[in-house]
A protein has these predicted regions:
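PLP-dependent amino-acid enzyme catalytic core
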Residues: 1-353
Length: 353
């Protein structure tokens, strides 16, 4: 792996020896949580888009969670960072793509709590000017390393390698998988489901569906578990933007069951609904349908959707509405990702450099 930049160290070594990572917590006492999200995030109708589609659409604005430029990943980080602190960890190692909103918010949160962040990205550093989230990582002085391989799975070995380096140096790292997709991380959206239930109680008609983009699967898993916990009648519909639908559904099912157990419940969970056909040219690359959907939302509601996740999920919802296959109010999770709007040509439909 190639080190892109190693910033100033702001964290002091922790006093505890725990460094098992995000998958190590056992059920029992309620998991600790740090307060990151400015909750509740708004739930509001999208009237002009609704008229365009002939279906009532509401936006759940998790692009307005608070830290940085907002985003859904803060919800899982409330539990993951709290667990790292409880284990006495002095550093956190995670990874994803070079334009990852997950790693950006993880790094910001770590810095706030005196934990040193380390980020592993697939691909190569390149020689051009950093843009979007990568530029923010560099500006913050975060240690970012590239695997030199195009496969996203190369990040997993990179996280393990950096974690090993830190342990060998006497540090106490907290490794977290890509996207924070662990049962503990999924608890963030179990909690969000309680928040959403209170907001939906004031509506005249309950929603029939809750739509979102699905990548690492933790957000959908938390929402599936949360819907079961709250007794919600809506269907949680994930639109995969990366992995095959069958693989995504399996991950959602496994994470949702484990998150429900951590939450102290054992509800009957429905089979995950994961839609496919909207990835376009590939993960991290805009699609024509996604860009058209994002432009429509911006022009009708003044809301920007990121090209990697939100735009593709909205394209699926729009297509289903126009085909007459969607009935009743639909909630769309706006999950953030604003920095990717300023990364290369992501917003115009060409692959970012």
């Amino acid at each position: 792996m190639t080190a892109v930049t190693t910033g100033p160290r702001t964290a002091s070594p922790g006093t505890g020896a725990g460094s098992s990572g995000a998958g190590s917590r056992r059920s029992g006492a309620a998991p600790p949580r740090v307060d990151l999200v400015l909750a509740p995030t708004p739930l509001h109708p999208a009237p002009r888009l609704s008229r365009e589609l002939g279906v009532p659409v509401l936006f759940k604005r998790d692009d307005l969670t608070g830290a940085g430029l907002g985003g859904n990943k803060l919800r899982g980080l409330e539990f993951l960072v709290a667990d790292a602190l409880a284990q006495g960890c002095d550093s956190l190692v995670t990874g994803a793509g070079p334009q990852s909103n997950w790693t950006m918010l993880a790094a910001l949160t770590c810095l706030r709590y005196g934990i040193e962040p380390h980020v592993v990205c697939y691909g190569s550093a390149g020689t051009g000017r950093a843009e979007g989230n990568l530029r923010l990582h560099r500006w913050l002085g975060v240690d970012v390393r590239f695997t030199g391989e195009a496969e996203r799975s190369s990040v997993d070995a990179g996280i393990e390698a950096v974690t090993g380096e830190l342990r060998a140096a006497g540090r106490h790292p907290y490794p977290v998988p890509r996207g924070g997709a662990t049962p503990l991380g999924a608890l963030g959206y179990v909690r969000a489901s309680l928040e959403l239930a209170a907001q939906l109680a004031g509506l005249d008609e309950p929603p029939a569906g809750l739509w979102l983009a699905t990548g690492s699967c933790g957000t959908q898993a938390g929402l599936v578990a949360g819907a079961a916990v709250t007794g919600a009648s809506y269907q949680v519909v994930g639109v995969t933007v990366s992995r095959p639908a069958e693989e995504a559904a399996g991950r959602v099912r496994e994470l949702a069951a484990a998150a429900a157990t951590l939450a102290g419940t054992d509800p009957d969970l429905p089979a995950p609904d994961v839609r496919t056909g909207w990835i376009g040219p590939g993960y991290g690359t805009p699609s024509a349908a996604g860009q058209a959907a994002a432009r429509l939302v911006a022009q009708t509601e003044g809301v920007f959707l990121d090209p990697v996740f939100g735009a593709k999920a909205m394209a699926a919802l729009i297509a289903e509405c126009r085909a007459g296959r969607v009935h009743g109010p639909q909630v769309f999770l706006v999950s953030g990702g604003a920095p990717t709007l300023f990364a290369g040509d992501l917003c115009t439909g060409s692959e970012a450099s």
